[in-house]
Amino acid sequence: MLMLRSPFSDSNVLDHFLDEITGSVQFPYWRNADHNSFNFSDNIGEIVNDESKFSVQLDVSHFKPEDLKIELDGRELKIEGIQEKKSEHGYSKRSFSKMILLPEDVDLTSVKSAISNEGKLQIEAPKKTNSSRSIPINFVAKH
């Protein structure tokens, strides 16, 4: 015999009530957040990829230049920042790591970086120039 349970039965209402209470206590922000509005690209900064160059700008204002490291392995650009503070009151650590795959037409030998007084890290590289050229055909008459 198949027994159907009413959605309005006492145990279902109690289960729903307990789920609401424990969920809001365990995950108060995440549960009520609008998950459709998250924009993770804001964390990257500004990326420009046009005909002449590829560039990335990051806000690293919370880091000193000596806390930053930029490495290029093939076309993989890795940007890291690690900041550690120790005091008599405790220890804190702040870090980030970004990996960006550079486009194939970027001149990897010309990648450069600079940081502004405001803490904006700019990494850029020109695009490879088209090395093909037209070769004229000269007519040589035999004597």
From Swiss-Prot:
One of its GO terms (biological process) is response to heat. The keyword Transmembrane does not apply. It comes from the Eukaryota. One of its GO terms (cellular component) is cytoplasm. The keyword Ribosomal protein does not apply. PROSITE patterns: SHSP. It holds the Pfam family HSP20. CDD domains: metazoan_ACD. GO terms for molecular function: unfolded protein binding. Keywords: Stress response. Residues 35-140 form the sHSP domain. Disulfide bonds: none annotated. Signal peptide: none annotated. Belongs to the small heat shock protein (HSP20) family. PANTHER family: HEAT SHOCK PROTEIN HSP-12.2-RELATED (PTHR45640), HEAT SHOCK PROTEIN HSP-16.41-RELATED (PTHR45640:SF21). This is Heat shock protein Hsp-16.48/Hsp-16.49. The lineage of its organism: Eukaryota, Metazoa, Ecdysozoa, Nematoda, Chromadorea.
